């Protein structure tokens, strides 16, 4: 999951920026989820704290942004731990990552670099020359980084983050208020990063977690580019929305039903674009376990694409 945990350091109570995984009582926890064109926004109100997280992939980029704004709506100063959590696979082959544990756990390692948790697959190959492989293998790098606030603590081991007999709804790393600053070697990897936000009454602060699979040097540059977090994220979302609204503007219908108009003009068209781009792969994040890319399905999606984007080659 793309989990963000919020912990009140005064009361030691904690919750998540989406209702799950913590799952607070809905009589006290209020939440909304909005799906837009290429982004999702989740808003939550609990214990005098309002949070809004926007998940998206910037236009023409290959990493995720989890843009979080937190507002103190109470009448007293609040100290909050904010923890972002991403669970990495060990083997990029989804099936092998599940069943071939004696191999998939053997090849994984996590370390902390500057403001991010770096996961390396086949880390022992990091000394070979760029572009070269051994047994068709090279180092694979994944990361979760933090922009807009300093890192207070981190964890790269799923078992250590969750704790024995704990689940994603009550991880020890969040309950304790401090991650253990330990990486992982030959176990199950994760990337967890905690920062502490001090908020005066009425104050809002904005941060971003960045997640991707890219070499370490480039990952560092990506995180550094979000120093002015709010301005960068707002601009990226404006570009993303403008692009998709432009794509969807070429073919529009107008009927007496607003719901039908929305379905045809936005969601049917957007879904056809997505399934065309991904070609009906089994998931948006991997292409294993099913039957890969479907030529027939892609041709079916073209029935709308050639109307909505007539200049597409």
Stretches found by the model and what they are:
Residues 1-298, 308, 312:
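Anionic coordination/interaction segments
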Residues 301:
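RNA-binding accessory domains that recognize and position tRNA/RNA substrates
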Residues 304-305:
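Cationic, amphipathic, low-complexity alpha-helical segments enriched
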């Amino acid at each position: 999951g793309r989990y963000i945990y919020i912990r009140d350091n005064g009361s030691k109570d904690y919750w998540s920026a989406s209702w799950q995984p913590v799952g607070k009582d809905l009589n006290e926890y209020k939440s909304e989820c909005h799906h837009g064109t290429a982004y999702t926004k989740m808003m939550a109100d609990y214990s005098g704290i309002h949070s809004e997280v926007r998940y998206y992939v910037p236009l023409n980029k290959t990493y995720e942004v989890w843009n979080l704004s937190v507002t103190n709506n109470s009448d007293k100063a609040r100290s909050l731990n904010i923890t972002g959590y991403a669970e990495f696979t060990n083997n990029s082959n989804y099936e092998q990552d599940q069943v071939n544990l004696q191999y998939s756990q053997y090849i994984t390692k996590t370390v902390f670099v500057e403001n991010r948790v770096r996961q390396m697959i086949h880390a022992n190959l990091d000394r070979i020359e760029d572009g070269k492989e051994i047994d068709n293998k090279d180092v694979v790098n994944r990361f979760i980084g933090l922009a807009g606030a300093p890192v207070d603590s981190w964890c790269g081991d799923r078992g250590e983050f969750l704790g024995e007999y704990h689940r994603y709804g009550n991880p020890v790393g969040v309950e304790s208020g401090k991650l253990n600053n330990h990486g992982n070697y030959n176990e199950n990897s994760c990337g967890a990063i905690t920062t502490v936000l001090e908020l005066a009454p009425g104050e809002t602060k904005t941060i971003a977690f960045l997640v991707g699979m890219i070499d370490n040097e480039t990952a560092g540059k990506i995180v550094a580019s979000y120093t002015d977090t709010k301005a960068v994220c707002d601009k990226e979302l404006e570009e993303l929305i403008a692009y998709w609204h432009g794509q969807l503007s070429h073919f529009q219908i107008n009927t007496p039903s607003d719901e039908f108009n929305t379905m045809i003009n936005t969601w049917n068209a957007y879904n056809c674009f997505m399934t065309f781009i991904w070609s009906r792969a089994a998931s948006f994040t991997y292409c294993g376990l099913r039957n890969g890319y479907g030529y027939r399905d892609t041709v079916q999606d073209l029935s709308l694409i050639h109307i909505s984007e007539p200049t597409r080659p």
